[in-house]
């Protein structure tokens, strides 16, 4: 089967024909001549209407999908048209967009592989440059953002991840509906303005349709949600609550361990950090024996550990009423414990009591677990590339990997 036959089968365009195919001068590439079909009119690139021809430009080279390790190039002399609406402009061709050197099919091909491999690996695999892979991904992401639909967003989750040294963060907003999880928004820095930018994009009408919002306890997030999604049920992030409690327990353990060392007592808490921080089911056999020995002593660390473990019952309730009663009793006990880091946690939980109980009002359907999973995928995307140089490229890569954007149509799906 000849190459021209294959191209006519998988990449045929109305008004154009493939004329000749030959090896390039280096014998490592294939060049295919393209010409307009006889009697076909050129199309204006401005108004997309047929227009009479004006003249021809020098021959341009468009990169196509490689074939068996050979680079493939389409060679075509672009026509200029004399459009009555736009004047003399270059014609529109169906296989390329604007001044891109890559054909649309090749850009989509590279973008799909760039979702599976790092951009550098994609460039090396198909004998192209990193910049061209970047251009391909930017084209596909730009097209997808223009054509995506944002209707029927019922639940969102917001969180931040670090993307560069020096406390540089991204604000990420996800859709976390049961049937659809995707990235909706990437905001630069962890600020009130960056989160407000998401609501500017979706508009007041879509914001009014949001029923559930998951976030952590950072005050700017709480303020924006209260202002923009007052009708939504705001659910606090379980992951961050557990993390804060573990941090408080670790502070108690570290302070008590230092005091015991200063007073010359036996170092009972030495190498005990993960024994008290890990969940029981994740402990090793050695850590279980170590924990059992620790629980024999009347230490602040032991009392703080028991308070932390006791709080895990909170998440097992189904009724908001009973969960609220347990929370109140736990906070009462903790405030009488004389363990300041744990008392600080109790005060925080009391201040956000209503938002904590919203988890049960939502029937436990929404939590931060989905958000943390998507955050891990976002970090993996950046880690595969060992980081990106600019915020713009980072934003593009995250949309490409996580936003589930629609893709341009092509005459043939190669993979």
Roles of regions detected by a PLM:
Residues 1-39:
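N-terminal alpha-helical interaction blocks
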Residues 37-41, 76-79:
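Short metal-coordination and nucleic-acid-contact micro-motifs, chiefly zinc-binding Cys/His arrays
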Residues 41, 46, 52, 165-168, ...:
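Acidic/histidine-rich catalytic cores and adjacent linkers
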Residues 48-52, 57-167, 207-210:
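Short, positively charged, Gly/Tyr-enriched micro-motifs
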Residues 90-94, 174-182:
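Gly-rich Lys/Arg/Thr-decorated short loops/hinges at beta-loop-alpha junctions or inter-strand turns
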Residues 99-102, 182-206:
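Active-site beta-loop-alpha junctions of metal-dependent nucleic acid enzymes
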Residues 99-108, 120, 185-188, 211, ...:
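Acidic, glycine-enriched active-site microenvironments
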Residues 241-262:
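Short alpha-helix plus adjacent loop in nuclease-associated cores
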